Amino acid sequence: MLKGALTALITPFNENGSVDEETFCNFIEWQITQGIDGLIPAGTTGESPTLSHEEHKKVIELCVEKVAKRVPVVAGAGSNSTDEAVELAQHAKKAGADAVLVVTPYYNKPNQEGIYSHFATIAKAVSIPIVIYNIPGRSVVDMAVETMKDLCQNFKNIIGVKDSTGNIERVSEQREKCGKDFVQLSGDDQTALGFNAHGGVGCVSVASNVAPKLCAELYAACRSGDYKTALELNDRLMPLNRSIFIEPSPSGIKYAVAKLGFCRDTVRLPLVPLKDTTKEIIDAALQHAGLIKE
């Protein structure tokens, strides 16, 4: 069900900081016409930490309605409160999402038993497919491969992982422990090519907010074994992949999307707008990728 390039969607804001629903829906339509393979609303790139619960749920509802089953929608449903994560997953199911993306609990730093129990509780509470989101760089906890194996073996609705460890070896380890049908999606644009060569089936991409066509073509080439084409596409995208993370994300990718004319580059505090020097680097990366003219 899940493969290829799945965009970790930005959430556009109006000048007053409210969610720009019209722009969001228009942006989703453009993503689909560009050939994107799936969409992920209300995740980290969508500034979920600073969305209210009502806004979070509305963003998912808008996305599901606009997509209308044309591509899979994987709704962000993570929280460091297990009860809250259950509530968000239940809402995503009710809204019509195809799956949920659930991050490892951040800040409270549970051990492996706590991580297992968190996901087990969610899996028991909902029938919707669950994708684990393992991002130790932000959550400060790392789900062990053995924990992941136990979860996928014990709960059939835990179907895969968005792996943002940046550790290519993990792909082979998780493939060995969790099986070949366990969906492994890279969560790191910069290492995604190697990730897919090791057995991944795509990427939850930040860069695809501005380059959905290029990203979809890259992972289609990976799936067909055409790594010559994949490498050429990756070379075009790599400066962009790097530059959008010079400052805390999603400030960089929001600026890039705004540069293409889709939305404002407004982010919510504590995130702040980019420095001019960073904007210049992103501009050059967009030119290198052929997304804007010099």
Curated annotation (Swiss-Prot):
Q: Which domain of life is it from?
A: Bacteria
Q: Name one GO biological process term.
A: lysine biosynthetic process via diaminopimelate
Q: Which family does it belong to?
A: Belongs to the DapA family.
Assembly and partners are described as: Homotetramer; dimer of dimers.
Name under which the protein is recorded: 4-hydroxy-tetrahydrodipicolinate synthase
Which segments cross the bilayer? none
Catalytic activity of the protein:
L-aspartate 4-semialdehyde + pyruvate = (2S,4S)-4-hydroxy-2,3,4,5-tetrahydrodipicolinate + H2O + H(+)
EC number(s) per UniProt?
4.3.3.7
Q: What SMART domains does the annotation carry?
A: DHDPS
Name the Gene Ontology molecular function terms of this record. Answer: 4-hydroxy-tetrahydrodipicolinate synthase activity
Q: What is its main location?
A: cytoplasm
Q: Does the keyword Glycosyltransferase apply?
A: no
Q: Which PROSITE patterns match?
A: DHDPS_1 (PS00665), DHDPS_2 (PS00666)
Q: Name one GO cellular component term.
A: cytosol
Which residues does this entry assign to the site Part of a proton relay during catalysis?
Answer: T44, Y107
Query: InterPro entries, alphabetically?
Result: Aldolase_TIM, DapA, DapA-like, Schiff_base-form_aldolases_AS, Schiff_base-form_aldolases_CS
Q: Where is the active site?
A: Y133, K162
